[in-house]
Amino acid sequence: MARIAGVNIPTNKRLVIALQYIHGIGEKFAHKIIEKVGIPAERRVHELSDSEILQIRETIDRDYQVEGDLRREVAMSVKRLMDLGCYRGLRHRRSLPVRGQRTHTNARTRKGPARAIAGKKK
């Protein structure tokens, strides 16, 4: 099992799919990485040599922000908004949708499970 960016990627999957197990790398970035390294997209992880895995690891470390660094940056961005006290920060603080979605009927994922209110039934 190859270990890239602190993640054990599955060995019997195609390289493009396996790279997507790393937080911060989707389909587009996975294709860019293997194109930059020069490995065919159809290759499977267990077919890679150690030098090819090392090239992929170096490319990701050099050019992309993934896993812990990416999670930390997102958390710091949200914290910055909350500290500023701007509208988006207030919405984050109250666990409500941030981007203008309606909250009268929907937004259950963000607001949590519905709570019963006495006298609300008609």
Swiss-Prot record:
<dbReference type="InterPro" id="IPR018269">
    <property type="entry name" value="Ribosomal_uS13_CS"/>
</dbReference>
<keyword id="KW-0694">RNA-binding</keyword>
<dbReference type="GO" id="GO:0005829">
    <property type="term" value="C:cytosol"/>
</dbReference>
<dbReference type="InterPro" id="IPR010979">
    <property type="entry name" value="Ribosomal_uS13-like_H2TH"/>
</dbReference>
<comment type="function">
    <text>Located at the top of the head of the 30S subunit, it contacts several helices of the 16S rRNA. In the 70S ribosome it contacts the 23S rRNA (bridge B1a) and protein L5 of the 50S subunit (bridge B1b), connecting the 2 subunits; these bridges are implicated in subunit movement. Contacts the tRNAs in the A and P-sites.</text>
</comment>
<feature type="region of interest" description="Disordered">
    <location>
        <begin position="97"/>
        <end position="122"/>
    </location>
</feature>
<dbReference type="GO" id="GO:0000049">
    <property type="term" value="F:tRNA binding"/>
</dbReference>
<keyword id="KW-0820">tRNA-binding</keyword>
<dbReference type="GO" id="GO:0003735">
    <property type="term" value="F:structural constituent of ribosome"/>
</dbReference>
<keyword id="KW-0687">Ribonucleoprotein</keyword>
<dbReference type="InterPro" id="IPR027437">
    <property type="entry name" value="Rbsml_uS13_C"/>
</dbReference>
<comment type="similarity">
    <text>Belongs to the universal ribosomal protein uS13 family.</text>
</comment>
<protein>
    <recommendedName>
        <fullName>Small ribosomal subunit protein uS13</fullName>
    </recommendedName>
</protein>
<dbReference type="InterPro" id="IPR001892">
    <property type="entry name" value="Ribosomal_uS13"/>
</dbReference>
<dbReference type="Pfam" id="PF00416">
    <property type="entry name" value="Ribosomal_S13"/>
</dbReference>
<keyword id="KW-0689">Ribosomal protein</keyword>
<dbReference type="GO" id="GO:0019843">
    <property type="term" value="F:rRNA binding"/>
</dbReference>
<dbReference type="GO" id="GO:0015935">
    <property type="term" value="C:small ribosomal subunit"/>
</dbReference>
<comment type="subunit">
    <text>Part of the 30S ribosomal subunit. Forms a loose heterodimer with protein S19. Forms two bridges to the 50S subunit in the 70S ribosome.</text>
</comment>
<dbReference type="GO" id="GO:0006412">
    <property type="term" value="P:translation"/>
</dbReference>
<dbReference type="InterPro" id="IPR019980">
    <property type="entry name" value="Ribosomal_uS13_bac-type"/>
</dbReference>
<keyword id="KW-0699">rRNA-binding</keyword>
